[in-house]
Amino acid sequence: MRRIISRSVILMFLFDMLAIASASYFSYRYFGLPQRFHIPTVLLTTVLGAIVLYLKSQYKIREFNVTKRNYYLLFEGVIFFNIVPFALLFFFVPKMSLVCYYALTILLTYVALELYRFLFHFYLFNFKKVKNVLIIGSDNNAKIIAEEIINKKALRMKVAGFFTDVEDENYQFVEDCGIPIYLNPYDLAKVIRKQRISVVIIAVKRRMEEQWLTHMVRSIPEGVKVYKMPEFYEMITGKYFVSKMSINWLFYDYMNKRSMLYDACKRIYDVIAATIILTVTFPILLYIGIRVKMTDGGPAIYTQTRVGKNGKKFKMYKLRTMYINDYKPKAGEISENTANVNDDRVIPFCKFVRKARFDEIPQMINILKGEMSIVGPRTEWEDLVKIYSEEISYYPCRMWVKTGWTGWAQINQGHCVMNDDISEKLQYDLYYLKHRNLFWEIGILVKAVFLALSGRHG
């Protein structure tokens, strides 16, 4: 399945690069701009286009759909990656010609990219072969993975049947879906052949008998992919499947993955990234701080007690964006309004400051002190940690690593406080915990910065 998704992504990526380069090349030639800047401009536009479209999540095939939001994000991205070449040519090209070049390049690029996506969507949902999936089991694990496959139509997969020898609590769900249920394990080979099964997912909680395992080995032909349910769940959601058994395996993965070299490299990366971010944004922070100070005379920077790695408390630095207030969320006051930029307590000019996450840049001080990391699970209030730890199973596991300024959960889900959302955020955090590596973390940081500047991070 990874190969199938990768082929689709590669094909779309290559077409995008061709469309961007062609649009830039044609516009440049059409308006007769200086020859010496021709090739550099086309190359720069193409490279920036690749980066921006990736950061705009244009290559998430498993979630691909045609929506107004996607139209907007693509158009916004096309404008973004053409700004830099426009700015570089500003002093060397007649202004009217440059404006016309910029407008025509945006128009041609957007039309080409949108047309390809429309055709890809049409092909995906009308001509691409649907892969039949057989799920071994009918318990809660089977229900969860079946729902994910049914809801993610862009996967082009269909649950063709369940194999089980036990009628459990989710047996009714299986029947309600109208999906065949096979109760005789020894019909496996016949069902795979008859239903043309391409993927088998093992979704049973209990330990399978040796006799049944041997029968599956004999019955499942070559070419049929076999996945454990948690592994398949991670592949199609980017989240960790949380259960008592999976947490045990996560513990072993985490313990065996610990490395002094990784920790040292990550620390160097944290220090370098935090220093660069602080240096680049210092003039902006100074301006915001002065304006906040002039608003009501209160401090520009304040601290909050947060919980970090292994439950250790520390003082986290933040740029104040609200009027002086000792407000802190209590157990009965947790609501989405806690982080709402339209809250009346927010200083008016600080609404964008919060939206772009400039108020969180002072956390670079915590990173330089070693209390936080650039990438990791979001740090939380002490009171909220107590509540979530009591109400959400395995919540403390996310504190096995340093909390982060940004993270996998933040760029995929954003900020949340409701328990159902926190449970989902935990899945993202544990996925990061299992798969963390330095190159991936650099990508998360780049995407987080881009989303923050777009006003969409968190």
Predicted regions and their residues:
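Aromatic-capped interface at the extracytoplasmic side
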Residues: R117-V130, G289-I301
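C-terminal terminal-structure detector
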Residues: I392-G458
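N-terminal hydrophobic signal-anchor/signal peptide
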Residues: M1-D16, F64, F118-F282
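Short, glycine-rich, amphipathic interfacial segments at transmembrane boundaries or analogous
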Residues: Y233-E234, K239-V242, I301-P348, T406-K425
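A short, structured surface patch at a secondary-structure boundary
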Residues: A339-K402, I444-A448, A452
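Residue-level signature of catalytic and energy-coupling elements of molecular machines
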Residues: G137, V200, V226, P283, ...
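Signature of alpha-helical transmembrane segments in polytopic membrane proteins
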Residues: M1-N126, G458
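A hydrophobic, helix-centered structural microdomain
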Residues: Y262-Y327, N366, L438, G443-G458
